Amino acid sequence: YFARTLDVPLEEAVARTKAALAEEGFGVLTEIDVAQTLKAKIGADFRPYRILGACNPTLAHEALKLEDKVGTMLPCNVVVQDAGGGRTEVAAIDPVASMQAIENPQLRTQAARVGAKLQAVMQRLVIA
C-alpha cells in the first residue's frame, strides 16, 4: 500500500483526499464511516476511520475489458484514519500487489498505471 500521514484533522484529510483523487481522474463511489457503522451494528467503539471507494472510470473500463473478474477488486479503497495527536493517515492499496493473484500480464501493466495515479494522489496530499 501507499501511505502518508498528515498533520490535519480527519475531516480535512478526507476533503483533501477527495480533491486529490479528483485531480487524478478518480471519483469517490462509496464512503464508509467504519466507526459509525461498528457503533450502530455491534455497539463497538472504534477510532475515526473512513473507507473511500475510488474509481477512475476510464482505467476501470480498460481493466474490465482485459479481465472480467477484476471487478472483484474494484473500486480502489483508500483509508483515511485518525493517527492520534491531530494527525491523520491516508493509505491506498497498491494495485500491482493486489493484481498479482490474477495471471494476466496486460492487467499488471494496467495496474501499474493505476498505481502511478494513486502515488500521485499521495504526493498531492503532501504538497496540499
Locations of the language-model features?
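Short amphipathic alpha-helical/adjacent loop interface patches that line ligand
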Residues: 14, 56, 115-118
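Terminal, regulation- and interaction-focused segments at domain boundaries
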Residues: 1-25, 123
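Compact, glycine-rich, soluble single-domain proteins
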Residues: 27-79
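Short glycine-/small-residue-rich flexible loop motifs, especially phosphate/cofactor-binding loops
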Residues: 18, 35-36, 119
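Conserved active-site and cofactor/substrate-binding residues in soluble primary-metabolism enzymes
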Residues: 8, 12, 33, 109, ...
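Well-ordered alpha/beta subsegment
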Residues: 101-128
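Beta-strand/loop substructures that line and gate deep hydrophobic ligand-binding cavities in soluble
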Residues: 77-104
